[in-house]
């Protein structure tokens, strides 16, 4: 199914059409929302979702975008979830840490989706599009969680995304998040990496920097459809 065909079938889903709003005009009715997940492995169907963060994107009166609001949750593994020891070693997540204070997948996803729907309404957008660094990985885990819980109101487009690894490769010649941030002049602390919150906020800075740089270069103007 093409993106346009999906949009036609879901025209009214997700909040107020309003292409007059500058954010809706900039991204064809989509609201970029940056997402990062930390997981128990690479398989979204079998491996645990352990952390998830999302950053909604705002736009100022000049048409420049900025990271607006962060949502972050440590997540309890779903029943029967696989967790690879190598994944925990890589992320540094300690499941038994007394301050981990994890919530269920349902709580995490519902709270994030509620915030995203609020941002959709505020920006006159009909649907969110996931922004991620290697976005297909994050989108796969979001979609798997939605399917596990049989959630009916997923504000994210099910297959379209903006990948900052690709965008940063184009803009800066770097595809690794830390190196792309360095090339973009964004501070990046490797000791904080592989926290969903930290990586999401840095990815949001990177995405906004690329979009704004393109605007400054005259690469986008607000044309009516």
UniProtKB/Swiss-Prot annotation:
GO terms for cellular component: cytosol. InterPro entries: Exonuclease_RNaseT/DNA_pol3, RNase_T, RNaseH-like_sf, RNaseH_sf. Mg(2+) 1 binds at residue 36. One of its GO terms (biological process) is tRNA processing. Residues 33-207 form the Exonuclease domain. Its cofactor is Mg(2+). It comes from the Bacteria. Signal peptide: none annotated. The keyword Magnesium applies. The active site is at residue 194. One of its GO terms (molecular function) is RNA exonuclease activity, producing 5'-phosphomonoesters. Trims short 3' overhangs of a variety of RNA species, leaving a one or two nucleotide 3' overhang. Responsible for the end-turnover of tRNA: specifically removes the terminal AMP residue from uncharged tRNA (tRNA-C-C-A). Also appears to be involved in tRNA biosynthesis. Homodimer. Belongs to the RNase T family. This is Ribonuclease T.
């Amino acid at each position: 199914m093409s993106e346009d065909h999906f949009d036609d079938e879901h025209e009214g889903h997700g909040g107020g059409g309003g292409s007059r709003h500058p954010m809706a005009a900039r991204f064809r009715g989509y609201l970029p929302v940056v997402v990062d997940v930390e997981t128990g492995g690479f398989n979204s169907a079998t491996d645990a979702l352990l952390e998830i963060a999302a950053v909604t994107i705002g736009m100022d009166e000049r048409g420049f975008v900025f990271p607006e609001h962060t949502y972050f949750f440590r997540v309890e593994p779903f029943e029967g979830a696989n967790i690879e020891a190598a994944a925990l070693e890589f992320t540094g997540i300690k499941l038994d840490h007394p301050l981990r204070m994890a919530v269920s997948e349902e709580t995490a996803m519902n709270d994030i989706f509620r915030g995203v729907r609020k941002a959709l309404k505020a920006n006159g957008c009909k649907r969110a599009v996931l922004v991620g660094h290697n976005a297909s990985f994050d989108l796969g885990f979001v979609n798997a969680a939605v399917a596990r819980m049989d959630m009916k109101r997923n504000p994210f487009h099910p297959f379209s995304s903006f990948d900052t690894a690709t965008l940063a490769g184009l803009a800066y010649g770097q595809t690794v998040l830390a190196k792309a941030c360095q090339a973009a002049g964004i501070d990046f602390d490797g000791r904080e990496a592989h926290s969903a919150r930290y990586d999401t906020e840095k990815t949001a800075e990177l995405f906004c920097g690329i979009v704004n740089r393109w605007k400054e270069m005259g690469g986008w103007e607000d044309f009516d459809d």
